[in-house]
């Protein structure tokens, strides 16, 4: 399927199924899954990055296993609002993944999601070594939660 706006995702997603959130890092792919009511995002184990074909196979397997009805992908926008090489790389990954699945994709501004995730893990007194293992999936949960909150607001006020 194609990339849709967050507003269009409500109609494009498969109803009764959770949404997945992704944080595409250079070494790992952070993953989070929503509940069926699309209220809460929960981090899942990250996927180590390899070559695209291997990444795609592992990711599509995970999305199938979780019965995801759509995918929110964190878009690393610069603080000034511009898109740099990381955003271009993220868009290219999704563009290459689209022909392999019928799931709709939506991008979500991920600015400061990793910072927020790290602060949350520090507040939970997670050791530095374990934070390194959990940071990408925690960031994916922050990304997904932001999108879920927006979807909830759209359902409450369809005009805005």
Swiss-Prot record:
The keyword Nuclease applies. GO terms for molecular function: nuclease activity. It comes from the Bacteria. Keywords: Cytoplasm, Hydrolase, Nuclease, Ribosome biogenesis. SUPFAM superfamilies: Ribonuclease H-like. One of its GO terms (cellular component) is cytosol. Its EC number is 3.1.-.-. The keyword Hydrolase applies. GO terms for biological process: rRNA 5'-end processing. Gene3D superfamilies: YqgF/RNase H-like domain (3.30.420.140). It is found in: Cytoplasm. InterPro entries: RNaseH-like_sf, YqgF, YqgF/RNaseH-like_dom, YqgF/RNaseH-like_dom_sf. Belongs to the YqgF nuclease family. This is Putative pre-16S rRNA nuclease. It comes from Chelativorans sp. (strain BNC1). The lineage of its organism: Bacteria, Pseudomonadati, Pseudomonadota, Alphaproteobacteria, Hyphomicrobiales.
């Amino acid at each position: 399927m194609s990339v849709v706006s967050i507003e269009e995702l409500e109609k494009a997603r498969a109803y009764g199924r959770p949404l997945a959130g992704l944080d595409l890092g250079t070494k790992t792919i952070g993953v989070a899954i929503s509940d069926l009511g699309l209220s809460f995002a929960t981090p899942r184990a990250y996927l180590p990055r390899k070559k695209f074909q291997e990444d795609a196979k592992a990711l599509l397997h995970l999305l199938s296993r979780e019965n995801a009805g759509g995918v929110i992908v964190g878009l690393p926008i610069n603080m000034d609002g511009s898109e740099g090489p990381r955003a271009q790389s993220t868009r290219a990954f999704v563009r290459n993944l689209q022909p392999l699945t019928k799931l709709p994709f939506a991008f979500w501004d991920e600015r400061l999601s990793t910072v927020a995730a790290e602060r949350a893990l520090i507040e939970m007194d997670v050791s530095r070594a374990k934070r390194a293992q959990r940071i990408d999936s925690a960031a994916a949960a922050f990304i997904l939660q932001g999108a879920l909150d927006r979807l909830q607001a759209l359902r409450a006020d369809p005009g805005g």
